Regions:
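N-terminal pre-domain/capping segments
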Residues: 1-102, 108, 180, 208, ...
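Hydrophobic faces of well-ordered beta-strands that scaffold small-molecule active sites
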Residues: 3-7, 31-33, 62-67, 115-117, ...
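A structural motif
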Residues: 28, 107, 112, 210, ...
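Flexible, glycine- and charge-enriched loops at secondary-structure boundaries
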Residues: 41-44, 48, 86-93, 124-131, ...
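Alpha-helix-loop-beta-strand connector modules within alpha/beta enzyme cores
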Residues: 49-67, 135-147, 173-174, 235-240
Length: 288
């Protein structure tokens, strides 16, 4: 099993070679870069090529990119204007599509295979106009991504338009060939199903089209992005759910949120906690 980490852990700061050194030193072999311009300036070729060199120097593979979720420079600004493929207003939708094209075009100088994308914001309500907007945007993006060797993977979230059943119905009805899913276990654990059924019932509609996974834990109330086993997810059950996917060797990306504050552990300690959690996860996986 390849050890993979999302750079979301460092999203509040610029991603540097020193961070990559820490990631590699903690035993990870690949990364998913979370795209905010203050973290990684993906629209400047010089920055992209420098990142390619830094990843190669630390023997890290770029397995995926996470699309920006906000027009603001920092993902940590909660007041930021959402960058959404569901924009009903055409001008704003085209702006979002152009920004996502820039992320896809990173593959020209820094190859990667999957772009992880949210279906709108965290509170996106289901609306036929938004659905049509998403279809129009994705139709163009899938074609553009295909030429770059990138698969678009829409992630399940806690919004109505990010609900797994909604996402599967969207794909079945629009027949968007090539669209895939990123299954986020932490988000699934926040669904409205009874706790013991949340993961299976969230995974079931997406199962045949899941191409990647985000691993993180929470206590079933908010999106905490904790290391596995630090929340209330039943990980042996979660592993059985993941192993039911038709695609073998799914990329499993650990997506942690940085703990901050005077008494917070250092980033190095948080990386160590992630590594320890993955040791336990892999041991359980092999026994299941």
């Amino acid at each position: 099993m390849q050890r993979l980490l999302s750079t979301y852990l460092f999203v509040s700061r610029k991603l540097t070679p020193e961070h990559l050194e820490q990631i590699a030193g903690a035993g990870f072999q690949g990364v998913e870069i979370f795209c905010t311009r203050s973290h990684f300036e993906y629209s400047i070729k010089q920055e992209v090529r420098a990142m390619a060199d830094a990843l190669e120097a630390h023997h890290l593979q770029l397995v995926s990119m996470h699309a920006p979720t906000s027009r603001d420079l920092s993902a940590m600004r909660e007041s930021g204007t959402p960058l959404s493929i569901c924009e009903v207003e055409r001008v704003r939708r085209v702006e979002a599509m152009d920004e996502l094209r820039r992320v896809i075009d990173v593959a020209d100088d820094l190859p990667y295979s999957r772009l992880i994308l949210h279906m709108g914001g965290t509170r996106e309500t289901a609306d036929p106009r938004k659905r049509d907007a998403a279809f129009s945007t994705l139709e163009h993006l899938i074609l553009h991504a295909h030429h770059a060797g990138v698969a678009i993977c829409v992630e399940n979230t806690t919004s109505e338009m990010g609900d797994p059943a909604y996402l599967r119905a969207f794909v079945d009805e629009t027949r968007l060939t090539g669209l895939r899913f990123n299954f986020d276990i932490g988000h699934a654990h926040l669904s409205d199903f009874p706790e013991e059924e949340r993961l299976e019932k969230s995974f079931s509609p997406l199962r045949e089209l899941v191409s990647s996974v985000h691993l993180h834990d929470n206590h079933g109330e908010k999106d905490e992005h904790l290391p596995p086993y630090d929340g209330t997810i039943d990980w042996p059950s979660a592993i059985r759910v993941l192993q039911s996917a038709p695609q073998t060797s799914l990329p499993l990306v650990l997506e942690l949120k940085e703990k901050t504050g005077a008494e917070a552990p250092t980033v190095a300690e948080q990386l160590t906690a992630g590594r320890t959690a993955m040791d336990r996860f892999e041991e359980t996986w092999e026994k299941t």
